[in-house]
């Protein structure tokens, strides 16, 4: 599944396609998260399948070698995680073991073996991962690394293990693969930019590419409501100058103009784009072909991040083919043509109706889409008017743009469909995509029985608020049993 998904990204023009973090040893497992691993020969075969799928389209393939340390729950392997100091393991009722010098030598051997397996799998870029509070960054952090031996002390002393790992990775893979270092430009407390800059400069001769970020993960991975495109720029702008090496970074880039500006201004040499590549795997190719209007832009809703946190296969609001490339044979740009002429009626022009009409129209069917509202988009049209959520309107806007290019699709607004009008139209197939609405009886995830509120109590749902209704009383109780984003 992952090989097919990454192969599609390579087909779409991405220059480098990476795995997410890739475990190097069973004492750092993240099951049931759907992560990668390079523990043994079986993993090499799996990784080689991904590399082959990426290479088929001329892109480079890479992996991020990962050891979680205190971030390793090890629910599957039941191994004891190792860390610079003994801390509770992530979301688990047990401790990590403080690494002695033998443990450190053993860890270095695990990392070197994983680098060799990455080379064996024909990968082009091998990441040394020293960010996001994983093991190498735990050694760098003064609060997590309280050691008094040669692996503790000043930042340069705490960086000893990182330097050893970089050197041994180069020794293992030679010039066959590039070495990328994923590292934060600040300390976990948000300070330390000056000493971190000295560290980056010192590490530069050992690194081919710097992949830089900051300690505040909410800035890197925040949703569009609170975190704007290119938010890391002020923090990382100095790295290229002080290291003299190519730099890549992320920032939920969706605008080609912003990407170009980052490169032209010398902030980065390469654009890192996880979420944008999920929303539109063909984004680079569309830029190259001058089809920027066809880019299916990420809306920053973070449904992809949610599925990562809930340990379930990846999904995307904008791209329904994501994760289904192998299982169902879906492709973000191509769809099987119709087998016979049919007229299809789609009732409801919300996100589901617009997507259904677009897909059916692309297949060549005659499609009529009708909605009683005066504007298309359904709920997302109202949501996108809420403060900070304008980007969500891209769900509607992109689909309307695509529908306008299909002469076989007709959209009718202010057209309520009744059984009589449906029968009169005489369509061969009817799709009802009228969506859903919030209940007023307060039933939800935990409140399973209807709640009988006091007489005279004005109960408003999110639908009411988005439609402009407001509470009549001064005192308001916010009741959230949805546990998602509404509250």
Predicted features and spans:
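Flavin-dependent oxidoreductase catalytic cores
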Residues: 1-347, 351, 355-367, 375, ...
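Beta1-alpha1 glycine-rich phosphate/pyrophosphate-binding loop at the start
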Residues: 210, 346-410, 481-487
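Glycine-rich, anion-gripping cofactor-binding loops and their flanking helix/strand elements
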Residues: 224-236, 241, 384-397, 405, ...
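Short acidic loop-to-helix transition motifs that present clustered carboxylates
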Residues: 254-257, 278, 416-419, 465-468
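Glycine-rich dinucleotide-binding loop and its adjacent helix/turn
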Residues: 324-333, 337, 402-405, 411, ...
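NAD(P)H/NAD(P)+-dependent Rossmann-fold oxidoreductase cores
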Residues: 389-390, 404, 420-421, 434-435
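A conserved short coil-to-beta-strand element within the FAD-binding core of flavoproteins
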Residues: 412-425
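Glycine-/small-residue-rich beta->alpha transition segments that form the dinucleotide
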Residues: 427-429, 433-443
């Amino acid at each position: 599944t992952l090989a097919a998904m990454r192969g599609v990204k390579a087909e779409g023009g991405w220059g480098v396609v990476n795995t997410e973090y890739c475990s190097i040893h069973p004492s750092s497992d993240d099951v049931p998260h759907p992560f990668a691993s390079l523990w043994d020969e079986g993993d090499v075969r799996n990784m080689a399948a991904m590399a082959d799928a990426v290479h088929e389209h001329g892109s480079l393939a890479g992996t991020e070698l990962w050891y979680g340390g205190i971030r390793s729950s090890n629910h599957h392997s039941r191994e004891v995680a190792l860390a610079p100091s003994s801390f509770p393991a992530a979301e688990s009722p047990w401790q990590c073991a403080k690494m002695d010098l033998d443990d450190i030598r053993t860890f270095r051997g695990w990392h070197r073996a994983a680098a060799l397996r990455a080379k064996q799998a024909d990968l082009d870029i091998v990441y040394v991962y020293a960010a996001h509070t994983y093991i190498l960054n735990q050694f760098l952090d003064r609060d997590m690394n309280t050691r008094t031996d040669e692996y503790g002390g000043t930042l340069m002393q705490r960086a000893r293990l990182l330097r050893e790992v970089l050197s041994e990775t180069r020794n293992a893979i030679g010039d066959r693969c590039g070495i990328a270092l994923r590292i934060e430009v600040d300390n976990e407390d948000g300070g330390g930019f000056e000493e971190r800059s000295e560290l980056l400069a010192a590490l530069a001769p050992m690194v081919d590419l710097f992949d830089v970020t900051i300690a505040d993960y909410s800035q890197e991975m925040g949703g569009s409501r609170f975190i704007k495109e290119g938010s890391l720029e002020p923090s990382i702008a100095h790295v290229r100058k002080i290291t003299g090496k190519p730099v890549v970074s992320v920032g939920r880039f969706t605008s080609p103009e912003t990407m170009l500006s980052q490169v032209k201004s010398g902030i980065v040499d390469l654009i890192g784009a996880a979420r944008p590549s999920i929303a539109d795997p063909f984004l680079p190719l569309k830029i190259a072909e001058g089809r920027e209007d066809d880019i299916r832009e990420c809306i920053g809703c973070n449904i992809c991040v949610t599925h990562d946190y809930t340990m379930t296969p990846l999904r995307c609001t904008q791209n329904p083919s994501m994760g289904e490339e192998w299982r169902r044979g879906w492709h973000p740009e191509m769809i099987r043509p119709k087998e016979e002429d049919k007229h299809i009626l789609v009732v409801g022009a919300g996100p589901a109706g617009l997507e259904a009409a677009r897909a059916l129209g692309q297949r060549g069917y005659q499609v009529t889409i009708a909605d009683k509202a005066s504007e298309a988009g359904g709920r997302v049209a109202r949501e996108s008017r809420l403060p900070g959520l304008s980007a969500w309107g891209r769900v509607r806007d992109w689909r309307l743009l695509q529908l306008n290019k299909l002469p076989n699709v007709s959209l009718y607004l202010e057209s309520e469909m009744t059984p009589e009008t449906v029968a009169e139209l005489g369509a061969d197939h009817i799709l009802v995509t009228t969506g859903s609405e919030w209940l007023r009886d307060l039933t939800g995830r935990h409140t399973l029985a209807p709640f009988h509120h006091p007489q005279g109590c004005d109960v408003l749902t999110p639908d009411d608020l988005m439609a402009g209704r407001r509470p009549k009383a001064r005192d308001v109780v916010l009741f959230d049993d949805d546990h998602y984003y509404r509250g």
